[in-house]
């Protein structure tokens, strides 16, 4: 089991204007952890989608919601937890309602909903959803060891 080195927690109001704060924090944390530029871009998209989902769906535009974003830094991975205490949902039921996306499907004709979670699952190495008082999305991205070595060599002390 990997040892956690650091844990950083953000408490964000459930408002669209704070999505960028979660994304920018992640960018700095992932860079410091040794992720490549491409991996950081994937992480930023996934975290933005998770926070946006909480803003849009958990609180339905109400101003009193709060989203917790936790960044857990391990020696070989970064785990990001986006949690809210808003309205929960059942993922499997939602997937059945919207149906599968087909390769080559016209983007103009796609059903609304589910695409954010699809993106998150595509961009991250592991994604888990937990339903308790709201929804928690736990996303994991592993650090490429070669990239960590290259970054370490380029840092001067």
UniProtKB/Swiss-Prot annotation:
PANTHER family: ANTI-SIGMA-F FACTOR RSBW-RELATED (PTHR35526), SERINE-PROTEIN KINASE RSBW (PTHR35526:SF9). InterPro entries: Anti-sigma-factor_SerPK, HATPase_C_sf, RsbW. It catalyses: L-seryl-[protein] + ATP = O-phospho-L-seryl-[protein] + ADP + H(+); L-threonyl-[protein] + ATP = O-phospho-L-threonyl-[protein] + ADP + H(+). It comes from the Bacteria. Coiled coil: none annotated. Disulfide bonds: none annotated. It holds the Pfam family HATPase_c_2. Negative regulator of sigma-B activity. Phosphorylates and inactivates its specific antagonist protein, RsbV. Upon phosphorylation of RsbV, RsbW is released and binds to sigma-B, thereby blocking its ability to form an RNA polymerase holoenzyme (E-sigma-B). It comes from Listeria monocytogenes serotype 4a (strain HCC23). The keyword Kinase applies. GO terms for molecular function: ATP binding; protein serine kinase activity; protein serine/threonine kinase activity; sigma factor antagonist activity. This is Serine-protein kinase RsbW. It is an enzyme of class 2 (transferase). Belongs to the anti-sigma-factor family. Keywords: ATP-binding, Kinase, Nucleotide-binding, Serine/threonine-protein kinase, Transferase.
């Amino acid at each position: 089991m990997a040892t956690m080195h650091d844990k950083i927690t953000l408490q964000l109001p459930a408002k669209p204007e704070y999505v960028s704060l979660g994304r920018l924090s992640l960018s700095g944390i992932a860079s410091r952890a040794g992720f490549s530029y491409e991996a950081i871009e994937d992480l930023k998209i996934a975290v933005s989608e998770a926070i946006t989902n909480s803003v849009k769906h958990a609180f339905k535009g109400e101003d009193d919601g709060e989203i917790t974003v936790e960044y857990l830094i391990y020696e070989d991975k970064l785990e990001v937890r986006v949690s809210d205490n808003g309205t929960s949902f059942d993922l499997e039921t939602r997937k059945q309602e919207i149906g599968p996306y087909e390769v080559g499907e016209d983007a103009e004709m796609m059903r609304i909903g589910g695409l954010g979670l699809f993106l998150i699952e595509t961009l991250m190495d592991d994604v888990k959803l937990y339903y308790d008082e709201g929804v928690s999305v736990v996303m994991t991205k592993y650090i490429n060891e070669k990239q960590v070595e290259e970054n370490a060599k380029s840092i001067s002390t």
